């Protein structure tokens, strides 16, 4: 049995969620809100969708937030919470990417009201009970079942026009959830199956997504659904810790940070998590041995035009030691030991874009 095979003993938790996946499903939003018995909802959506969604919901939309910000700044979360209190909201509708869903989660955390989510990116956040806010350059995360959307409407038509320069990193963001779920210490036979299916679905969809093919967008959306499912039932490890420290601490773009880091962390963990590395290697075009999966994933990402250097995202080189120190101050469980020197080499390579060893 390999070192990252599913433990013989495990605890598996699965929450109830209604998922509607079909073209045009966004039009079903009013019916789903009514089905939950919601009368006074706060709409959290990007500017592209806010007015449209508010119009669909009519008098039920008592608050409209059209400017969700990346990494959920706590000051914005508090402001929207105050508006929700004043309007006596009994539910939330989040339409957009991870920022919209994340802000809705921050409000649900304090107001204990249900969320209906309509994702327009591949973040996978809509399928998890994970929440996060950022204050003073520090990203704080946690888990609470109340923040997990009760209903998720996946509508591939909403992704038409999603620029490939943003879509591809968004898909890698979701992929990271499944990769870490596959080597999580609390994985189960179910999460292993979902994570491997998610990895295969997303890596298969990515070339078509990069070519702006509608089939690629639909495939990546299915992959994001499964990637989020796998993360919802497992713990996060080194990859997510690094992404939270770097993204939240230095205001780097969220999905792009995940994209750069994932091959390096996979390479770091490959020997200790060969099953996860094998799942990635098997799904890549042409295949790759587990020991080479990290480098193969890096080459694959570069070939799709994805970012490969933290330096290009705005991380200063003199911040690398601080990144490592912050990760080690409160580490997440990880299959490979967190050695400071090795971790420092990892972030240096990710910063410069050097090949994964």
Describe the predicted segments one by one:
Residues 181, 185-296:
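Active-site segments that bind and position negatively charged phosphate/pyrophosphate groups
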Residues 26-30, 49-52, 74, 99-106, ...:
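Short glycine/serine/threonine-rich phosphate/pyrophosphate-binding segments
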Residues 1-90, 310:
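ATP/NTP phosphate-donor binding region
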Residues 31, 109-193, 198, 276-279:
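A glycine/threonine-rich phosphate-anchoring loop and its flanking beta-alpha core
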Residues 84-107, 111-122, 242:
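A short, small-residue-rich loop immediately preceding and capping a beta-strand
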Residues 18, 40-42, 62-63, 90-93, ...:
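Structural motif
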Residues 2-4, 287-357:
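C-terminal charged capping/lid subdomain of soluble metabolic enzymes
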């Amino acid at each position: 049995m390999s070192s990252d095979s599913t433990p013989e003993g495990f605890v598996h938790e699965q929450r109830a969620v209604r998922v509607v996946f079909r073209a045009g499903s966004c039009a079903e939003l009013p019916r789903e809100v009514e089905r939950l018995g919601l009368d006074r909802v706060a709409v959290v959506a990007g500017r592209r969708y806010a007015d449209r969604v508010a119009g669909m919901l009519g008098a039920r939309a008592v608050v409209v937030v059209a400017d969700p910000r990346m990494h959920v700044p706590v000051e914005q979360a508090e402001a929207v919470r105050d508006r929700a209190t004043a309007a006596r909201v009994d539910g939330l509708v989040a339409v957009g990417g991870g920022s919209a869903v994340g802000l809705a989660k921050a409000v649900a955390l304090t107001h204990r009201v249900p969320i209906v989510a309509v994702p327009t990116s591949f973040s996978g956040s809509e399928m998890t009970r994970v929440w996060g806010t950022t204050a003073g350059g520090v990203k704080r995360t946690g888990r609470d079942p109340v923040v997990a959307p009760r209903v998720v409407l996946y509508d591939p038509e909403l992704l038409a026009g999603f620029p490939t320069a943003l879509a591809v990193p968004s898909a890698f963001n979701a992929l990271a959830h499944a990769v870490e779920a596959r080597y999580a210490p609390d994985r189960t036979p179910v999460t292993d199956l979902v994570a491997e299916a998610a990895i295969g679905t997303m890596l298969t969809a990515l070339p078509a997504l990069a070519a702006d093919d509608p089939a690629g967008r639909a495939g990546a959306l299915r992959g994001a659904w499964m990637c989020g499912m796998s993360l919802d039932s497992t713990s996060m490890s080194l990859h997510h810790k690094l992404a939270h420290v770097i993204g939240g601490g230095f205001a780097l773009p969220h999905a792009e940070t995940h994209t750069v880091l994932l091959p390096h962390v996979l390479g770091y963990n490959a020997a200790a998590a060969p099953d996860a590395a094998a799942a990635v290697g098997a799904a890549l075009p042409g295949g790759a041995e587990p020991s080479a999966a990290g480098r193969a994933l890096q080459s694959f990402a570069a070939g799709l035009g994805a970012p490969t250097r933290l330096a290009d995202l705005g991380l200063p080189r003199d911040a690398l030691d601080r990144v490592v120190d912050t990760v080690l101050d409160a580490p997440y469980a990880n299959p490979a030991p967190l050695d400071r020197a090795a971790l420092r080499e990892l972030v240096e390579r990710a910063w410069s874009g050097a090949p994964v060893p």
